[in-house]
Amino acid sequence: MRNASPRQQRLLERIYQRSGVMHRHCIPLPDSSNPSTAERMRSYQPAALELALEACRLALKDAGIEASAITHLITVSCTGFGAPGFDLALIANLPLAMDVARTHVGFMGCHGAFNGLRVARAFVEADPSACVLLCAVELCSLHLQEGWNPDHIVANALFADGAGAVVAVAADGADVGSINKTDLQLVASTSTVLPGTEELMGWIIEDHGFSMVLSSKVPSRIAAQLRPWLEQWLASLGLTLPEVETWAVHPGGPRILAAVLESAGLQPAQIDLSTAVLRQFGNMSSATILFILERLRTTAGREGPCLALGFGPGLTVEAALLKVQKPI
């Protein structure tokens, strides 16, 4: 931060040291001081496409599926806009069939990929022959903000750029979606808005990028209100909290992870994948949960029910129950 006083410099160092982020990736910002939203959006489209292409190619290769077999394309992003968007560019560059069905989940925030997964599951339930490619790409660094607004300082310390993708098909003999073929099944999902929290988190379009509203009250509200809702939903599925040993929690930041630990009565080891992704990549908004699920799929010794959680403006809480079963 330019022209920081010694006191301000110490504040920045303290916030960054406590962010839980050791490494992250960011695209170069436009070559101007405090660029306009229009300048930032001009940088979004080509960079988003580059990251999305890499993520989609990796997902297709991992699933053993040709791009031409994809019947549905779902894209997720809250950090940029454009029409035609990067989804059409994916069709041309992967390439996908020209008649692929496209759905975009836009501007929902960090929990956007949960909604994308829900849509993917609906597609494969409606048509068992469907083959869905889901891609979430976020360029959070485009919206770095100058100045000493506390919300902006925290956001600058946490957020990063990244893209993740998965392939979803109908699971053999089950009415559920399967991520990257057979090893991670989406069994059920749900969503709620925590009462009285509408003003605590926001993502606002302003003249110089998108601006984050992030109240310090968010973790305490999650800690107080999460458990009763989760217990009720899990009971409807015949499960209790102690029966869920594996968790995939969107790491909005260390305090949000700590709030989930407190509310759900978890041990730190149960969210180690979330902590590791935050440390290695930062908070990549909607793409982050796909990084965590990828590690869940490929980590030995993690089988059985898994509960994924995401948080966003509202305060919205998204939950997904997944079944981890390693391929034979």
Positions of predicted regions on the chain:
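Conserved beta-ketoacyl condensing-enzyme motif
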Residues: 15, 19-96, 104-107, 241-257
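Short coil/turn connectors at secondary-structure junctions
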Residues: 67-71, 98-101, 126-132, 153-154, ...
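Active-site-adjacent elements of ketosynthase-type condensing enzymes
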Residues: 82-89, 134-154, 188-206, 253-262, ...
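Condensing-enzyme catalytic core mediating Claisen C-C bond formation in acyl metabolism
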Residues: 1-46, 131, 140, 146-224, ...
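A short glycine/serine-rich beta->alpha loop
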Residues: 38-44, 75, 102-105, 151-153, ...
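Structural beta-sheet core signal
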Residues: 75, 133-134, 167, 249, ...
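Secondary-structure boundary elements
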Residues: 61-67, 123-131, 169-182, 238
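Claisen-condensing/thiolase-fold acyl-transfer catalytic domains that form or cleave C-C bonds
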Residues: 53, 60, 78-80, 97-128, ...
